[in-house]
């Protein structure tokens, strides 16, 4: 039985839910209905105040950064917004000296391809990427093998908190412990965790936690974000600072003085409209509380998983909800055909080659929608 059904009162806040059976928040969270009004606020300030709008825009970008940071337990002033995670990964790479004896990044073959592409290039800087294969089932990381790969040559350890293909919720604690034993930094990619799994970056003990807003946060494109632990931020010196990454951007001083803390990662002119667009969804999640979101998510994904198994479908996600994020990956057979037919029938899900169809009931979805998508899969396979 689903819990926190009172959250369904928020369905009108997400217009796409009235137009389709939307079960794809793992790939693009539903837009909040207040987003157009917030964007109108942004354009009104520009139209009425011109350059003076920066007096409102700049603090608003920082406020929104603090709101999204709070959703992963980050203290105020420790999170920065940028356009994408790719930008932020590049900045982190530029902060590190890859020319010494400590020149390795340890990561997993199950990471997001964009991240693996970045790590594959550190050899150009004198570094080495150690890519540890996942477990043979392709569902989970091989944590023991990753821990064994971390040694005094390791500069950085990077892994996802929730794996994008299979929704595996990774226990990062052994990686953090081992990395810090040998003096390495730890960066966790929380893109598939934030907004659906309770996260406390301080308790995790990570040095950097990176993510974006396209998925369960429902913040839309253009809102990558980075938390940097205060004890390491002053030692990190990104090559690309832009004018917002310096101590006094409006002094226009040609001599570089890094901004304190995480602000040095702010880069150039911020994506003000993206921050305005994301704010309503962030604020809604802050009001609800991620713990309640998680409880509702599990109350929907567990019946989804169990019913899929009962129908004879292959499930490529952990069966234990404590080890799973917000989506379930299902291969009913003929996955590409089933996926395409689901879309034709008004179900929005997505397909990942080699694993199956990803389905993610978020807090705004109903138990009936979960049952309906499985019934539709069965109907497609039966030729109905």
Predicted regions and their residues:
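Pyridoxal 5′-phosphate
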Residues: 1-384
């Amino acid at each position: 039985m689903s819990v926190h059904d009172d959250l369904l009162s928020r369905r009108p806040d997400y217009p796409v839910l009235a137009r389709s059976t939307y079960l794809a928040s793992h790939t693009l969270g539903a837009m909040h209905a207040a987003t157009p009004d917030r964007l109108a606020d942004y354009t009104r300030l520009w139209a009425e105040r011109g350059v003076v709008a920066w007096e409102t825009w700049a603090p608003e970008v920082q406020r929104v950064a603090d709101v999204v940071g709070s959703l992963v337990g980050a203290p105020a002033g420790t999170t920065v917004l940028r356009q994408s995670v790719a930008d932020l990964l590049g900045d982190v790479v530029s902060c590190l000296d890859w020319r010494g004896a400590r020149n390795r990044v340890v990561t997993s073959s199950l990471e997001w391809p964009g991240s693996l592409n970045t790590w594959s290039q550190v050899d150009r800087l004198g570094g080495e990427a150690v890519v540890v294969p996942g477990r043979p089932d392709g569902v989970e990381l091989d944590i023991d093998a990753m821990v064994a790969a971390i040694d005094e040559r390791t500069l950085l350890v990077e892994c996802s908190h929730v794996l994008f293909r299979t929704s595996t919720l990774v226990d990062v604690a052994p990686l953090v412990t081992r990395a810090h034993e040998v003096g390495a930094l730890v960066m966790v990619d929380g893109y598939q965790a934030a907004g659906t799994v309770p996260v406390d970056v301080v308790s995790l003990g990570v040095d950097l936690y990176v993510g974006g807003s396209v998925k369960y946060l429902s913040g839309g494109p253009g809102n990558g974000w980075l938390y940097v632990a205060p004890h390491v931020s002053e030692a990190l010196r990104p090559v690309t600072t832009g004018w917002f990454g310096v101590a006094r951007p409006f002094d226009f001083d040609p001599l570089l003085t890094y901004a304190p803390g995480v602000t040095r990662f702010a880069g150039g002119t911020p994506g003000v409209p993206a921050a305005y667009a994301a704010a309503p969804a962030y604020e809604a999640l802050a009001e609800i509380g991620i713990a309640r979101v998680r409880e509702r998510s599990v109350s929907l994904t567990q019946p989804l998983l169990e019913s899929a198994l009962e129908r004879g479908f292959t499930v490529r996600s952990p069966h234990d909800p404590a080890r799973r994020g917000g989506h379930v990956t299902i291969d009913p057979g003929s996955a590409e055909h089933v996926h395409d037919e689901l879309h034709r029938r008004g179900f929005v899900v997505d397909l990942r080659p080699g694993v199956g169809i990803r389905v993610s009931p978020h807090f705004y979805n109903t138990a009936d929608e979960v049952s309906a998508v499985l019934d539709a899969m069965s109907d497609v396979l039966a030729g109905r």
